[in-house]
Amino acid sequence: MSTHQRKVLIVEDDPAIREALLEAILSDGHAAVGAVDGAEAVRKFGVEAFDLVLLDIMLPVMNGYDVCRRIREKDRRVPIVMLSAKGSEIDKVLGLELGADDYVTKPFGLRELLARVHAAFRRHDLLAEAPGAAPVTADTFYFGAALIDRRRFTATRGDVATELTARELQLLELFHRKRGEVLSRDFLLNAVWGIDYMGTTRTLDQHVAQVRKKIDDTAAKLIKTVHGVGYQYIG
């Protein structure tokens, strides 16, 4: 992983939490910029370059979901880690559907959060700096009937192109390379989220569900669930 200093946008309306996050990122050797509401976050993201966004959901002016959507309109690759006291499955799924890469439920420990930030940096570096490690072709490959474009982060069926998040693309590439193999949930989590990932396998299941929707595999004919083990790409 690249060790250069990163720049993190921290979007949090609670002053105490925002200052704690700013201090943690600065102490970790990176630059940090704070935003107190959704509108300020969108404005700052539009004029400055960031390597990661820590994004609270319950924000004044514009909520975190709308901020995530606006950021993804400008940049499909920057890692977005959502922060929220709303820990229900539907809240997490909505965040992932909008393009978030991770979801941390409050209250959280700063060590756990930094571990997730480090993992997000590593995944981004592997995708951006080492494209030769994972591609099926230079830029595109087929997954079933969907054409996957690695540069544009899209899955296209016919004339309809659907955007992919970085993790969704990594999952598709991994399934494609391991076609026919039964891949355990632990293997997939380690390969895509990193060995220090502290979440649950439910996050993986949610991502696979989103991937299935985007490649029109809701009947699980391409990505088969192997109960008690993981998944298998049989396309």
Which positions does each model-derived feature cover?
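Structural detector for helix-capping/boundary residues
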Residues: 48, 144-146, 151, 186, ...
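N-terminal/domain-start alpha-helical segments
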Residues: 1-128
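Positively charged, aromatic-enriched patches within helix-turn-helix-type DNA-binding elements
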Residues: 105, 154-219, 224-229
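Conserved active-site beta-strand element of glycosyltransferases/polysaccharide synthases
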Residues: 232-234
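Short, Lys/Arg-enriched segments at the junction into DNA-binding effector domains
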Residues: 6-7, 119-181
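Short, polar/charged, Gly/Pro-enriched helix-capping and turn/loop motifs at alpha-helix termini
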Residues: 78, 127-131, 218, 222
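A structure-centric signal for secondary-structure junctions around beta-strands
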Residues: 5, 77, 90, 137-138, ...
